[in-house]
């Protein structure tokens, strides 16, 4: 399978150094148009994709690789801006990756560990039926959930179909040896 963790569907609010030039644009409709063209080209070449970082990492200023970012906006703001590319692209997205960002007005848990975000918003309201990959569980933005096995448990319980542990072989080994694996409906 030819696959990439792209496109980045985050909006460029001009305040997130970690997203920065990874974002296509500030306008969600422009992001949707450009990302659709990118994904269509990838599909023609036989490559699967992953839209990230649901519901949006562009507004939060902190870098989730080193700390847990917080986005204090209400759900209505996020829906009318950051979720637009996900809503417009729908089944074009082979998979989606949630953000290691907390949205306290919506859920106390970071999006990748939140049933509110993954089950109610992404799968429920937006009707998304593809795969959900966690973001890298070895990132500092995920560490507030607990140790590595607790993170993998929480991501899977929230609705992730697959978990990622990058550049940390010992943590990957710990999860492989201790995780209670379940089959999700995405594989049926």
Predicted regions, residues:
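Mid-sequence acidic-hydrophobic segments that form the walls
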Residues: 2, 12, 41, 45
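Short glycine-enriched loops at secondary-structure junctions
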Residues: 2-11, 51-57
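Residues forming well-ordered secondary-structure scaffolds
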Residues: 4, 19, 26-37
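Conserved aromatic
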Residues: 24-25, 145
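Second-shell residues forming the walls of enzyme active-site clefts
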Residues: 30-187
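Surface-exposed, active-site-proximal loop segments in enzymatic domains
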Residues: 14-24, 63-69
């Amino acid at each position: 399978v030819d696959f990439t963790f792209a496109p980045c569907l985050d909006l460029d609010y001009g305040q997130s150094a970690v997203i920065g030039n990874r974002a296509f644009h500030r306008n969600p409709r422009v992001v949707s148009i450009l990302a659709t063209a990118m994904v269509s080209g990838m599909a023609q070449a036989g490559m699967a994709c992953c839209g990230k970082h649901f519901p949006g990492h562009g507004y939060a200023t902190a870098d989730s690789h080193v700390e847990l970012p917080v986005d204090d906006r209400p759900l209505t703001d996020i829906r009318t801006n950051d979720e637009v590319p996900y809503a417009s692209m729908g089944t074009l997205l082979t998979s989606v990756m949630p953000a290691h960002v907390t949205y306290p007005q919506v859920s106390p848990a970071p999006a990748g560990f939140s049933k509110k975000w993954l089950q109610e918003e992404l799968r429920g309201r937006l009707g998304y039926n593809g795969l959900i990959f966690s973001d890298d569980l070895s990132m500092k933005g995920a560490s507030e959930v607990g140790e590595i096995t607790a993170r993998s448990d929480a991501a899977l319980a929230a609705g992730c179909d697959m978990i990622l542990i990058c550049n940390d072989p010992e943590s990957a080994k710990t999860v492989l040896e201790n995780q209670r694996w379940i089959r999700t409906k995405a594989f049926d």
